[in-house]
From Swiss-Prot:
One of its GO terms (biological process) is viral RNA genome replication. Residues 574-665 form the Fe2OG dioxygenase domain. It comes from the Viruses. It catalyses: RNA(n) + a ribonucleoside 5'-triphosphate = RNA(n+1) + diphosphate; ATP + H2O = ADP + phosphate + H(+). SUPFAM superfamilies: Clavaminate synthase-like, DNA/RNA polymerases, P-loop containing nucleoside triphosphate hydrolases. Fe cation binds at residues 592, 594, 647. The keyword Membrane does not apply. 2-oxoglutarate binds at residue 656. This is RNA replication protein.
Length: 1658
């Protein structure tokens, strides 16, 4: 072992070490399963070490507790040993619970006999009455086993047992007796058990817990010494019987003995363990003053060496050393006297001289050598007289006696005549054995029914009516309207069951009896042609041949009673029918009563829960009772209970089986239709020992028989059982009754009930409460056609099945005729097509009018001969012609992948691996070439190519398989389809590379794996013995974005592995026929399809997008989206596909992948406007007078402010006076001279924005239209000159972002899912408003604009002006460098009014739909906003503001795209939308065409700015639902801090618009600002600093008479807060507020400060 360990330690390659660890882990996992069988308990570490010393393992992860789990593990281990020793035949078990057969691994078919007897009271709970004998009995078998009860017997009892059991040869017995008790020593294994010595006996205490303790007499220990037991006969002379005993195993205090008839040899000495203890000599007198206990030899030697190692030993030193060497657990086994005696012993030994004082033999002369013997004799005599020397005394004190637990066997003699033992009463057990034998004979001898015989019987049943009792016997019972319980019959039933030892009654209620069966026979029901498959269970009906039963137009197949079923029913009473049901996982049946007409009203119903668990609910007049049924439980509903109770079943476990017994008094309704199950068909060409896997076939494709999506789903649909519902089930061609042969579609008989009738749940025991629906006329017609066809089957199908070479498809095509089938190009593969779930009898054509083959690229490949993989998987693959073949794996492809991983060119997870691992991977890929058994499965999406593998993965053991998936979507799909498989069996491809592998590796959709990955994985993972690749070569393959990666130059993996695929499944179960044929794929799903295309999105539909950018953005919005290429694994009834500029860039494979996802509905979402002839319409723009139609403007109701509310009186306050000279000093002090702040132009000089010498006035830049320098600097900064073509090109490229902006805007503003219909009346009203607003201007203003009304004025021309203004924003107050100004664009007046109408129209709709938590400062006043703030704003945390940079010029083509999508969603006429786009792309000034941007003179400027701000905010940030938000143009504020969406990092480079977030703490002096106002808990107040500074500017300009009133009204809102201002404003803001109040008073505006809140400003 040291050599092996050293060799392993010398291995430094991490991959090899990982492989070794994986193999070790697999072995550990297997061993832990074995350990769990014997020891399932959580064992303390010390006890676990003791168990491992005894050869019993412990699971360190177990959490199951037991008071003496370690001793239980020893007991289970001995049971396992006994199980290996017992013969594979019937054995008698004495004093053993039947459940312990599991530990012995005894098969129930051995039919072991249990003879138990109540020796102690606790035995009553151990053994049920079913196998308890009243006295000792003889043993009828050759071998017997006694479990832990031998100590209750003596040697005479054993002899008596052998004498009365002539068949008994061998008796195994376990006994629990600690051998150390014979010496009154403490426990040898104190961590496992302890021993007390009291009351002239000893007590064995497992685990130190008294609950499991046993008291023993010392005489019981004699069993440990027994070697032979001799019986001398009645006369006590000659030995007539000898029993030889031998101990086979000893584990702690548990021992296994074998007693054999005959005089055989047995070891003379019986060893119970190694000798490790010694007894110290008694060196003191009297004798009781010595240490009389045994101590470990190791401890004795340590104490001796210590006592002799120090110079002068003291008694204290010895005591201290003893305490040091002894563990705490050992100290509790010694008394104080014992410790003192031991210390004295070693103190004396330590004091004696250890130097040998006797003569030496070295260097003696001849004389001395001759006289040495005489001298020694004299010395010995002298020491006997005078005493020994010190060294001699020491040697005598060290004569330790070894304490051994080995014992010599003894011979025991017994005489006299033993009493006779009766024969055991095992009638009940023999009855169970007979049931089992009958079942075995029934199942093993069952004859396979051929298809011809089965269908012939079905045809006869369809013509012959079932035989029923004569009408004379059908006497209707007397109706009992009160539905009372038959008390007399119920008492008789309870009495009968109480006397039956085979059942226990646990609950006796007024309407029911609930109990448990003493013994549940081992049995099973095999699904065959007698099985009726319902929606969530399989059913069998047992009864006399003359009886028939059914419900809801369904008739069950009547089967004669199985003997074991009848015997179970006889336990509970007299019954003539039984309904057996096996349920699926989670199956349930609603409340119902067994009150059909075929039963009497006082019928007794007994339900037995044989296997699995379920919940049984009983609803009575007094309430509802619920029981959790486990195997063996039963419930009997008393006579009359069906009239006053209802019962239900739920929470069934997988394969939960029940038997329901009833007495059927009269026939069922004659309208029942018998369900024909045409399964159980032998396939002559595909014979295998393994069960044939057959995929589930699709529903019928007949238009007449197919259940439509809107039709109700039947509750109970009788179909063929899972074993029978396979691809080999015959299929009937249903022909219309009129003989027409149009659209002859396949109808599977197994699916016929599902598509023709509606049923309700079956019985548990009987019916549901709903009434059955009458058969429709169409259903009757279908049944007539079916029955007529079935009657002809015996003559038409006999020849078809006579040949061994014919396959199932021969019968399927019989109705069409052999010529039609042989004419199919793929008729040779028709059997294979059938096994895949397709009929293959249709000719379908693709878009190019070429015939579509269901199977393509069929080839024959050599089969691999060396496959180290599970045989069941290999056989399953062989059944569908997918046998593995040897595939060589390219070293070139593997080395390219390894090099990229090593040099960090690809991957995410592998980049985090250490350098050594990456280098090792690259080395393995470069050096190793592999040939591996591989199966390549190609098939279209939805073809079921992975279905076989998923079934096998769900059933195989853990550790056998690893499934590698390329995408998370595909990983979820596998997890959903294999819910019982451990999740660690499914891995993404990078995780699979760094984690453990398995013997079988499945790579699904392998075309999406990186090129070279498969080869590298095979090179790295030596554990892989079989590789299965599934994929579709027509779908998208992996795309490597890094051009420097070597794998980017490799061909797709499908190009290499296609030649190792036996055939390609070019058929699908997913898509409707129309969709599939459009893709060139065969499909038999005849469904109506829907294809739509529009510029709006369907809500709730899965969305496929061409780019990762858009996918991430949509996911951040909470919409499920996938890329075209990344949607593999998605199957959905409907899907929407986004079309944008990236769509034409996608390959054919990518588009095929996207288009094959939906079943029958596809919606194309076009994100850009349709390219039609819009430009010519713009040339017909009329003159201003012509488009101003004098229509009467709709009178809009004037806004009436709400009645002013009386606010709580706020106490008046007084602000201390502030220093006016220092109020703006923080802004004035940093100012520099005028020219250092002004803008400079080389030709025009400096601008003139800094006015006067007053430092306060210099804080405000004055921008003037006549300032040429500022004008040209503004054009340079704000205007970008381009060409119309460039604008159009930029617009077309921006569609990828515009739709994202709109979808976020739509979600934020709660717009409806579908486009908003155009309202002409609303448009006319908005148009009138715009016209009236324009005509309300002064005449001079209209005259000045006459040029722009001229028809010769270019509609695309813009007159550009510089806006004159004082810049008063607080953030720009006292700026050290003057910034460019703002432009005013004057468009043609017709254009302004047209798009002003469009903006106003969308504003009206926006106002009506705007959510309450969003406020837009448009057509509102501060009072309204203040009230809204108090109701909606959250001041408990931080707030958020957006500060945009160059907001107008940043609204480029992306924002234009957003505006157009928004306009189309509002159903604005196309010509108006196209004109707006043309204007934005062709607008020009005197310098040329300007780039797409926002201009201040446009009609929709404010509304467009506001909506762009909303769209930007919600695209960039996660905005909490219901968060209060304020918007006005480029100003915005939110009542919560916003976190940026991860998708925005992909969108941000495409957007010109930039912003900086401002976070406010919303505390005193730091509240959010909006349009110069502060958002405070008391409402909206004007910023005191900005208000005061602008007042000083107005005061300097001497225009106070015009503005003083407005300043007073703005100040009034804050002034009326009075003392509350202290809670809101900073000290500086309070100073500015106080100074402004003083100014208002000085200018006689103080009276305005006290106006009420609802005052309307004029």
């Amino acid at each position: 072992m040291a050599t092996i360990r050293g060799a392993i330690d010398r291995i430094t390659d991490t991959t090899v070490r990982t492989t070794l660890q994986e193999e070790a882990c697999r072995q550990i996992r297997t061993e832990l399963k074995n350990v769990e069988h014997v020891n399932r308990y959580a064992i303390p570490p010390d006890a676990a070490d003791a168990l491992e010393h005894l050869g019993i393992g412990t699971n360190p992860f177990s959490v199951k507790l037991h008071t003496h789990g370690a001793c239980k593990a020893i007991e289970n281990q001995l049971l396992y040993v006994v199980g290996t020793l017992l013969p594979k035949e019937r054995v008698t078990m004495l004093f053993l619970k039947k459940a312990k057969l599991n530990f012995m691994k005894r098969c129930p078919k051995f039919q072991d006999i249990f003879l138990n007897q109540h020796i102690e009271p606790r035995d009553v709970s151990r053994y049920c009455d079913f196998n308890v004998q009243s006295t000792s009995t003889s043993i009828p078998t050759h071998t017997a086993y006694i479990s832990d009860t031998l100590h209750f017997m003596d040697r005479k009892d054993l002899v008596r047992l052998f004498i009365n059991s002539p068949n008994l040869d061998t008796l195994y017995a376990t006994i629990v007796l600690p051998v150390e008790a014979a010496y009154r020593q403490p426990s040898r294994y104190p961590d496992l058990y302890q021993i007390n010595y009291d009351f002239d006996g000893f007590q064995y205490i497992p685990g130190g817990h008294g609950g499991g303790a046993y008291h023993h007499e010392f005489s019981h220990l004699e069993w440990l010494d027994v070697g032979h037991i001799h019986w001398r006969g009645p006369d006590n002379k000659d030995i007539q019987l000898t029993i030889t005993a031998q101990m086979i195993e000893s584990l702690g205090a548990n021992h296994l003995f074998c007693f054999r008839r005959g005089n055989l040899r047995t070891p003379r000495v019986r060893t119970f363990g190694r000798d490790t203890q010694v007894l110290l000599p008694k060196i003191f007198r009297p004798v009781d003053k010595n240490f009389n206990r045994a101590i470990p030899l190791t401890l004795a030697n340590k104490m001796l060496l210590y006592a002799k190692s120090i110079n002068t030993v003291t008694f204290r030193d010895v005591v201290a050393k003893t305490r040091q060497l002894m563990k705490d657990k050992e100290l509790e086994t010694y008394t104080g006297a014992d410790l003192l005696h031991m210390a004295n012993y070693f103190f004396v030994v330590g004091a004696l001289s250890g130097v040998n004082s006797y003569d030496q033999m070295l260097g003696l002369s001849a004389w001395e050598a001759c006289t040495m013997a005489l001298k020694n004799t004299v010395t010995n005599l002298w020491e006997r007289i005078t005493g020994k020397r010190e060294f001699g005394k020491l040697l005598e004190a060290l004569e330790w006696e070894t304490l051994t637990y080995s014992r010599q066997v003894t011979q025991k003699y017994v005489g006299g005549t033993p009493a006779r033992l009766p024969l055991p009463d095992i009638t009940d057990q023999e009855e169970i054995f007979a049931q089992q034998e009958a079942l075995d004979a029934l199942t093993s001898g069952a004859t396979k029914i051929t298809t011809h015989h089965l269908m012939s019987a079905a045809a006869r049943r369809s013509t012959e009516g079932p035989t029923m009792p004569t009408p004379a016997a059908q006497v209707p019972p007397t109706q009992n309207p009160k539905h009372t319980i038959d008390e007399v019959a119920s008492r008789a039933l309870v009495t009968k069951l109480q006397k039956n030892k085979r059942v226990y009654i646990q609950d006796d209620g007024p309407e029911y009896i609930m109990g448990h069966m003493a013994e549940v026979p081992a049995w099973y029901l095999e699904q065959d042609e007698t099985t009726t498959r319902l929606r969530n269970r399989c059913a069998w009906f047992f009864g006399p041949p003359t009886h028939r039963y059914g419900h809801n137009d369904i008739e069950y197949h009547t089967t004669e009673y199985y003997p074991w079923v009848e015997r179970i029913g006889n336990i509970f009473g007299k019954f003539n029918t039984c309904l057996a049901q096996t349920h699926d996982q989670g199956a349930r049946i609603g409340y119902h009563a067994d009150d059909e007409d075929c039963y009497d009203k006082d019928v007794t119903v007994a339900t037995v829960n044989l296997t699995g668990n379920a919940t049984f609910s009983l609803k009575t007049a007094t309430g509802t009772r619920t029981w959790k049924l486990k195997p063996g439980d039963f419930i009997v509903l008393k006579p009359g209970a069906q009239g006053c109770t209802k019962h239900a079943i739920s929470d069934c476990t997988t394969n939960r089986t029940s038997l329901t017994f009833r007495w059927q008094a009269r026939p069922c309704p004659s309208q029942l239709r018998r369900v024909v199950n045409l399964g159980n068909v032998n396939n002559p060409k595909r014979k295998s020992k393994a069960q044939q896997w057959t995929p589930k076939t699709s529903n019928s494709d007949s238009p007449r028989l197919t259940q439509t999506p809107n039709s109700p789903t039947p509750k109970d649909v009788p179909v063929v059982s899972p074993k029978l519902a396979d691809a080999t089930a015959p299929t009937i061609r249903a022909v219309p009754e009129n003989g027409a042969h149009t659209n002859m579609a396949c109808v599977e008989l197994t699916d016929l009930p599902e598509t023709t009738t509606t049923h309700r749940p079956g019985k548990e025991p009987i019916n549901d409460l709903t009434d059955s629906e009458p058969e429709t006329e169409s259903e009757q017609t279908e049944n007539l056609v079916l029955n007529r066809f079935i009657q002809d089957l015996p003559t038409t199908s006999t020849h078809a099945w006579a040949s061994e070479t014919d396959s199932i498809c021969s019968f399927q095509a019989e109705a069409l005729g052999p010529s039609s089938v042989e004419a199919l190009p793929w008729h040779e593969h028709l059997e294979l097509i059938n096994s895949l779930g397709f009929t293959g009898l249709e000719r379908q054509y693709g878009p190019d009018n070429n015939l579509i083959w269901p199977i393509t690229h069929y080839r024959t490949l050599p089969k691999s001969r060396t496959i180290e993989a599970p045989t069941d998987l290999v056989e399953l693959l062989d059944t569908i012609d997918r046998h593995p073949t040897d595939v060589p794996y390219s070293k070139t492809r593997a080395s390219a992948f390894g090099s990229d991983v090593k040099n960090l060119r690809i991957g995410a997870l592998v980049k985090n691996q250490d350098k050594q691992w990456r280098a090792s991977l690259a080395l393995l890929c470069e050096e190793n070439e592999h040939v591996l058994p591989t199966t390549v499965i190609h098939g279209a999406g939805g073809s079921g190519k992975s279905h076989l593998l998923q079934q096998w993965v769900s059933s195989t053991e853990r550790g056998n398989v690893v499934v590698i998936l390329p995408t998370i979507e595909l990983l979820r799909d596998w997890l959903n389809k294999c819910p019982t498989t451990p999740k660690d069996s499914f891995k993404t491809f990078e995780k699979a590379l760094v984690q453990n592998s398995a013997p079988v590796v499945i790579m699904d959709d392998y075309s999406k794996l990186p090129p070279g990955y498969i080869e590298a994985y095979v090179a790295l993972k030596g554990q892989c013995k079989l590789l299965v690749l599934t994929g579709d070569p027509r779908q998208s393959h992996y795309h490597e974005e890094n051009p420097e990666a070597l794998i980017s130059t490799l061909d797709p993996a499908t190009d290499y592995f296609s030649k190792y695929c036996t055939y390609n499944i070019n058929a699908t179960h997913r898509n409707a026929t129309t969709f599939a044929n459009a893709l060139g794929v065969y499909s038999e799903r005849k469904l109506p399809v829907s294809v739509t295309c529009s510029s709006y999105q369907k809500s709730g539909w899965p969305t496929l997008v061409p780019s990762i950018l858009k996918k991430t953005a949509l996911n951040d919005m909470g919409q499920r989206s996938l890329t075209y290429a990344g949607c593999q694994g998605l199957t959905t009834p409907k899907v929407q596909i986004v079309l944008d500029n990236a769509t034409p860039l996608c390959s054919e494979q990518v588009m095929y992948t996207a288009l094959s996802r939906a079943v029958d509905q596809i919606h194309f979402f076009n994100t850009g406007p349709n390219h039609s002839d819009y430009w010519e319409k713009m040339n017909a723009t009329p003159f201003l007078k012509t488009f101003i139609d004098h229509t009467r403007e709709e009178n809009l109701k004037e806004h009436q402010p709400a009645e002013p509310t009386v606010r709580e009186h706020t106490p008046a306050t007084h602000f201390p006076p502030a220093n006016e000279a220092l109020a703006l000093e923080p802004w004035v002090e940093p100012l520099t001279d005028k020219h250092s702040r002004e803008l400079h132009h080389k030709a025009l000089g400096h601008s003139n924005c800094v006015q006067t010498d007053n430092p306060v006035v210099q804080l405000f830049p004055h921008q003037q239209a006549k300032d040429e320098t500022l004008f040209w600097k503004t054009i340079d900064a704000r205007i970008k000159i381009t060409t119309p073509e460039e604008n159009v090109r930029n617009f077309n490229m921006a569609s990828d972002i515009g739709d994202i902006l709109f979808l976020n805007y739509k979600e934020a503003m709660c717009l409806p899912a579908d486009p908003i219909p155009f309202q002409q009346s609303l448009w006319d009203s908005c148009q009138a408003e715009v016209q009236q607003t324009y005509l309300s201007k002064p005449l001079a203003a209209l005259a000045n604009a006459a040029q722009r009304q001229d028809p010769d004025f270019d509609s695309n021309k813009i007159q550009l002006f510089l806006k004159s203004q004082w810049v008063k924003k607080v953030e720009k107050l006292g700026c050290l460098k003057i910034k460019p100004g703002q432009t005013i664009a004057s468009f043609m007046q017709q254009t302004v009014m047209l798009y002003g109408t469009m903006a106003r129209y969308m504003r009206r709709i926006r106002i009506s739909l705007c959510p309450s938590h969003i406020m837009i400062n448009c057509e509102t006043n501060p009072t309204q906003i203040s009230s809204w703030v108090r109701e909606n704003w959250d001041f408990s945390g931080q707030s958020h503001e957006n500060d945009f940079e160059a907001f107008d010029q940043s609204q480029d083509a992306n924002m234009l795209q957003f505006e157009l999508i928004k306009a189309k969603f509002h159903s604005i006429p196309e010509e108006i939308i196209a004109g707006y786009k043309h204007l934005k792309c062709h607008a020009h000034i005197f310098l040329g065409t300007i780039a797409i941007m926002r201009l201040s003179g446009e009609g929709p400027t404010f509304d467009a700015n506001t909506e762009c701000s909303i769209a930007y905010n919600h695209t960039r940030y996660f905005v909490p639902k219901g968060c209060a938000q304020l918007y006005a143009g480029d100003d915005s504020a939110c009542a919560a801090p916003l976190s940026e969406k991860p998708s925005f990092q992909h969108i941000s480079p495409e957007l010109s618009l930039k912003s900086k977030a401002k976070i406010r703490s919303q505390t005193k002096g730091d509240y959010a600002t909006f349009c110069g106002w502060l958002i405070t808990p008391k409402g909206f107040i004007k910023n005191p600093t900005q208000l005061y500074a602008s007042w000083l500017l107005a005061k300097h300009n001497k225009d106070l008479q015009d503005v003083a009133r407005n300043y007073a009204l703005d100040l009034r809102i804050a002034y009326q807060l009075k003392d509350e201002l202290y809670e809101l404003l900073s000290p500086e803001e309070l100073d500015h507020h106080q100074l402004l109040v003083r100014e208002m008073v000085k200018h006689k505006m103080g009276h305005l400060l006290n106006l009420p809140e609802g005052f309307k400003q004029t």
